[in-house]
Amino acid sequence: MTIAVFPGSFDPLTNGHVDLITRASRMFDQLIVTVGKNTSKQGLFTTSERVAFIEAAIAALPNVTVQVEQGLTVDFMKSVQATVLVRGIRNSTDFEYEQGIANLNRHLAPQVDTACLMADPQYQYVSSSLLKEVARFGGDLKQLVPSMVAKAMVARLEGDH
């Protein structure tokens, strides 16, 4: 049985994330989506809120679970016997960044392989900072994030401009 892990901060969860999770769920026996905190970014949603958004979005995917992760992803992977780390790639900048992380992870945990999935072209330009800016100024988020996330973003950022 192949267990894969798809880590991220998911702040906010995007339709691009949901697309990658759905595609990865078809490739592996079990997929664990891990929610972590990106210490270099100001958070919009709490960890609990992000977990709830993901769980709602993936409810129809029986082989996908969501867990909170603190620490090194490869250490978490060892603890659940996962052997594949799934990453989404939007552009060449993402690729170069992920290549460096994959090499480091391979050094720390030789049993871990990284599988990079190319983002669907309709989501290649989407980033969390861009989405927050769109929400702050009342832009339409319907095609970019799940509806529950769009509503929560508008409520959270209302009057923040």
Swiss-Prot record:
Gene Ontology molecular functions: ATP binding; pantetheine-phosphate adenylyltransferase activity
Compartments (UniProt record)? Cytoplasm
According to UniProt, the reaction catalysed is: (R)-4'-phosphopantetheine + ATP + H(+) = 3'-dephospho-CoA + diphosphate
Task: Report residues binding ATP.
Answer: 9-10, 17, 88-90, 98, 123-129
The EC number(s) this enzyme carries: 2.7.7.3
CDD domains in alphabetical order: PPAT
The site feature described as Transition state stabilizer is recorded at 17
Q: Name one GO cellular component term.
A: cytoplasm
Tagged with keyword Acetylation: no
Question: What GO biological process, any one, is recorded here?
Answer: coenzyme A biosynthetic process
The entry assigns this protein to a family as follows: Belongs to the bacterial CoaD family.
Return the protein name: Phosphopantetheine adenylyltransferase
Q: What is the lineage of its organism?
A: Bacteria, Bacillati, Bacillota, Bacilli, Lactobacillales
